[in-house]
Amino acid sequence: MITSIVFDVDDTIYDQQAPYRIAMEKCFPDFDMSHMNQAYIRFRHYSDVGFPRVMAGEWTTEYFRFWRCKETLLEFGYREIDEETGNHFQEVYEHELENITMLDEMRMTLDFLKEKNVPMGIITNGPTEHQLKKVKKLGLYDYVDPKRVIVSQATGFQKPEKEIFNLAAEQFDMNPSTTLYVGDSYDNDVMGAFNGGWHSMWFNHRGRSLKPGTKPVFDLEIDSFEQLFGAVKVLFDLPNLSLIHI
């Protein structure tokens, strides 16, 4: 039986592609917007690849943000941009992030869990101040105790490292074997949960494909916000219906 649940933030609690798309349209109007979904996925890829260098002290956060923007654009045949242009994109992107809201289906899911008194938590990769600002903006403190929110930069670890999941299990007072982690990234969220001995739900609403030869290690896969509420409701309303084998 699953007794507790922990969520990723970016592109799980809210639609992160929306602010990215608006920033791209404003800053690079000649970019082929038909590639937007794939460009966003690659932007997230470069975020995952580059941020460890910030954690290691090799790059500044500012350079990392410029680099992920530049590399994404180059991959889609766009001209190489300079740091000033990249910094402007980041400013516009951050401004658009001020407008993020929790989607109705996610709010319905969290309301249900709160009503059921299910312990909840948050594990998110990224710069501490930046991520906590999102947590507050999204109203997550209405559902999650601040002591059950972990941002990677503040710990020295990051998803998919098992250490951040071990730390969360201890800090949140949750049993990994009965805790479900929900996130959109297979590499960070699903593999991270697996590494930490947690269960996982892959929230694959961007339609990502696994690399050839990859053995799936998630317990459940859903592909829309609409499916999220139904899956969570079944887990906690009908615990004897074994969607997840403990």
Residue ranges: model-predicted function:
Residues 2-9, 13-104:
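N-terminal helical cap/lid subdomain that shapes the substrate entry/recognition surface
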Residues 60, 100, 122, 180-181:
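Residue-level marker of alpha-helix boundaries and capping positions
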Residues 18-22, 104-108, 133, 162-163:
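Generic recognition of short, well-ordered alpha-helical segments
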Residues 1-5, 111, 123, 127-243:
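Asp-based, Mg2+/Mn2+-dependent phosphohydrolase catalytic module
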Residues 105-118:
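Catalytic-core regions built around general acid/base machinery
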Residues 65-68, 109, 164:
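Internal, well-ordered alpha-helical segments in soluble enzyme and binding-protein domains
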